């Protein structure tokens, strides 16, 4: 007896909504607080998930019927994820030397130094890892809270501005970081655990983020056979799973696959 919000389960609600739209129905939609876990959870989180699920459902219905439906919020379509552009770690100054030794042992090279921040770019194949040891700002706060860990993930999509517009329409929280002169303002939203999710594309200046924001060191990689990032796995509290499932599935062009 599994009760969850639209977009969190497997029931074809968009098909039901398509049939409902064909009748000309333009009334209200409502959600019941379905299960005891929702009732015992954060009222704010459940309310946000419920609101987001209805926004997604109406958008999905409009796309399937090929016209606007009452209540649908105009937004760009879900974005296919083309690649992981970089993975950013918040690292303390004390732990940074050991982290750098680990990266070198894995065949990574320090390919760039940020033009204005205590941030380095490490590279091997198509894998880019950013080490951020800034003494203030988002990464510093994240490191204090979580320790040395991944603080941001950058995904390449066809249109970064369209992705951030869809994210905003779906009630995701935009993040505005400090941007120095001549540096890129990379669109981002808050993600799991307070981390950041950046959007990049290859059709705008954002596609040159590495050369714009970093000075090349010329250091060559001692290649260890690592070529790219083939998947991303995130750990969370059991109670958060449905929230973040909806976050990703409503924002991106995704499909569910059986777990191993």
Could you describe each region identified by the protein language model?
Residues 56, 66-112, 123-176, 183, ...:
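Glyoxalase I/VOC metalloenzyme domain signal
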Residues 33, 116, 179-180:
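Residue-level "edge-of-site" marker
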Residues 1-75:
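Histidine-acidic metal/acid-base catalytic patches
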Residues 38-50, 117-134:
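Accessory recognition modules or surfaces
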């Amino acid at each position: 007896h599994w009760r969850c919000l639209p977009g969190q389960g497997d029931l074809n609600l968009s098909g039901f909504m398509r049939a409902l739209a064909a009748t000309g129905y333009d009334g209200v939609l409502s959600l019941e607080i379905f299960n005891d876990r929702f009732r015992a959870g954060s009222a704010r989180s459940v309310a946000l998930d419920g609101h987001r699920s209805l926004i997604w459902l109406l958008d999905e219905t409009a796309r399937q019927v090929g016209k606007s439906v009452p209540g649908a919020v105009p937004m760009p379509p879900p974005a296919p994820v083309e690649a992981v552009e970089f993975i950013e770690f918040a690292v303390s100054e004390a732990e940074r030397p050991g982290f750098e030794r680990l990266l070198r042992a894995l065949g990574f090279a320090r390919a760039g130094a940020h033009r204005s921040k205590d941030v380095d770019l490490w590279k091997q194949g198509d894998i880019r890892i950013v080490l951020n040891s800034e003494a203030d700002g988002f990464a510093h706060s994240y490191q204090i809270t979580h320790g040395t860990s991944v603080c941001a993930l950058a995904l390449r999509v066809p249109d970064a501005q369209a992705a951030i517009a869809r994210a905003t329409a779906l009630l995701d929280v935009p993040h505005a970081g400090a941007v120095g002169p001549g540096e890129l303002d990379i669109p981002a939203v808050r993600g799991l655990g307070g981390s950041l999710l950046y959007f990049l594309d290859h059709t705008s200046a954002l596609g040159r983020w590495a050369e714009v924001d970093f000075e090349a060191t010329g250091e060559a990689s001692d290649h260890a056979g690592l070529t790219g990032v083939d998947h991303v796995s995130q750990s969370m509290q059991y109670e958060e799973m449905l929230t973040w499932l909806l976050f990703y599935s409503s924002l991106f062009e995704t499909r569910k696959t059986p777990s191993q």
